[in-house]
Amino acid sequence: MTDGGRVVVAGAGLAGFRAVTELRERGFTGQITLIGAETRPPYDRPPLSKKVLTDDGVDPSLQADFGALDVDFRSGEAATGMDAQTLATDRDKYPYDRLILATGAVPVALPGPGRQRFLRNYDDALALRALFRPGLRLAIVGAG
């Protein structure tokens, strides 16, 4: 797929980031738009549960030069729907010739009472870190 055209990538996590870099590395010359719901640039998620929870100075951002890649990066826009030709977000509509869905998953809340927190994104990690204190008791569900 080296010809022109418009590719829209919904999801600016590692999979979306890798999709746009791979397209360019394989010679795709068309328009690429990368859309992410988070306001941050793409970042690596594994450090969220390791370094970000314990260290203020960690930046898990992927080194992305969207200008050099000629990628239109739209942050803070959540995909809300699509049809065969257009991806809709909470801000705009993006026509495409090819669509890559790389939105990932959402956490599932467990039934029952109790305070549940999720570790899905950078802001979740910061919120959890703020709750940590000596003697805190917690249960961790999931090993993703």
Outline where the language-model segments fall:
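Conserved phosphate-binding and hydrolysis motifs of nucleotide-dependent enzymes
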Residues: 11-16, 104, 142-144
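FAD-binding core/adjacent interface of flavoenzyme oxidoreductases
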Residues: 1-4, 64-141
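Beta1-alpha1 glycine-rich phosphate/pyrophosphate-binding loop at the start
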Residues: 2-72
